[in-house]
Amino acid sequence: MATIKDLIQLAQNEVGYLEKKTADTKYLYDKKANAGYNNYTKYAKELDDLGDFYNGKKNGYHWCDVFVDWLFVKTFGRKRGQELLNQPNKSTGAGVGFSKKFYQAEGRYYSSPEKGDQIFFRNSSGQMQHTGLVYDTDKTYVYTIEGNTSGGSSVIANGGAVCSKKYKLTNTSIDGYGRPKYTKAETGENVNPDKVLYTRYVSGVDYEGLVIHNTPGGPDTDKLLQVGTKVNVYQISGSWSRVGINQ
């Protein structure tokens, strides 16, 4: 299952991408080639190619929000990505103000950040102007990866690149944070704490997997972990392994 960690890793891999001066697919997938300021990107192309993701074609338009949407679709798949973004098919989600409203409608808009949030910025008139992905936060700063921006500490709403940035939490340009409704598994948390069990491998016609024992050498629990089940190995002693299993 994809997680916030995967989402952030994908975003970090895209840092340095430059928008293109033409829509020529020969260059869309090269980070640096054919750079220009006409807002053509692989992100908009791929979402446009889905046919009904947005209410119209978006390549050639401002793409900060398109970049965030692309990250979610690429990481979690289209269906789950749209659920996390609170966006229907043929949505207006390429617009920053509309994306904010999608979160607000679900009660998912907050004043303090968490990893995996979508950050929203406003201009001096209070209008939404820019957005990005939160990849970390501490007591002083929020750290972001943004599309259609440039380096530096100020908010750049149409800068032409994917950049890693940071802002003080008190920055008045920050309007708020949209928080996708991640499952515990998607946050990377264990669904339940590890239950410590003892196991050994038994081969033969009756078992093809790991038989669970509560103590080393004790009677089995009539539970079987099928081959391929992932466990956390804490200790190995002879033929016994002490493992944690998410149950």
Describe the residue ranges of each PLM region:
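Tryptophan-centric aromatic hotspots in well-structured domains and transmembrane helices
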Residues: 63-66, 70, 123, 239, ...
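N-terminal capping segments
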Residues: 1-75
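Aromatic- and glycine-rich peptidoglycan recognition patches
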Residues: 2-9, 107-108, 125-205, 219-220
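A generic structural motif
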Residues: 73, 121-122, 135, 244-246
